[in-house]
């Protein structure tokens, strides 16, 4: 059985999905996942489809050195740095669709689902080599990642009872 880093608050009202050793850049995928945290499922899927169509950009916050600015990120991040990581968006979108299917099988309300947990971890690096001048060899590494996410149903807040007026002693 696969171990997740966290357990959902209500396991009967949540669905999980995980991808391991995915050949997609860790840094781009981390920024993509961070942009989707706590987002409703339908909104997240629409957002990733817009990223693939270059209508909205992913804001780059941590791994942002050398990342250019774009007006599409102005309202989501102060310095406006962002990109359109297509491969990362496609992998995360596929994982969201997988989790949605898992939720349908469990009988959950798909319209009420939101991303309660999404996490990207570094996987083992894959080593290749490139041949350089004068007989030297340099490493040619790829940085794959593991992605895990949990979709949960929004819980309706319990309504507070109307206070009954109790006469106080004076």
From Swiss-Prot:
GO terms for biological process: cytoplasmic translation; hematopoietic stem cell homeostasis. CDD domains: Ribosomal_L22. InterPro entries: Ribosomal_uL22, Ribosomal_uL22_CS, Ribosomal_uL22_euk/arc, Ribosomal_uL22_sf. One of its GO terms (molecular function) is structural constituent of ribosome. GO terms for cellular component: cytosolic large ribosomal subunit. Keywords: Ribonucleoprotein, Ribosomal protein. Belongs to the universal ribosomal protein uL22 family. This is Large ribosomal subunit protein uL22z.
């Amino acid at each position: 059985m696969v171990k997740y880093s966290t357990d959902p608050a209500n396991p009967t009202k949540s669905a999980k999905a995980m991808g391991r050793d995915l050949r997609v850049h860790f840094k781009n995928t981390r920024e993509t996942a961070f942009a989707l945290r706590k987002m409703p499922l339908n909104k997240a899927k629409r957002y990733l489809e817009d990223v693939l169509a270059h209508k909205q950009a992913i804001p780059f916050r941590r791994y942002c050195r050398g990342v250019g600015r774009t007006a599409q990120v102005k309202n989501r991040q102060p310095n406006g740095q962002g990109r359109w990581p297509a491969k990362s968006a496609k992998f995360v979108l596929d994982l969201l669709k997988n989790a949605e299917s898992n939720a349908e099988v469990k009988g959950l309300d798909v319209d009420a689902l939101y991303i309660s947990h999404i996490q990207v971890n570094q996987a083992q690096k894959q080593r290749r080599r490139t041949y350089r001048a004068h007989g030297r060899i340099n490493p040619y590494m790829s940085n794959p990642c593991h992605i895990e996410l949990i979709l949960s149903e929004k819980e309706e807040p319990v309504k507070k009872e109307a206070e009954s007026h109790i006469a106080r002693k004076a």
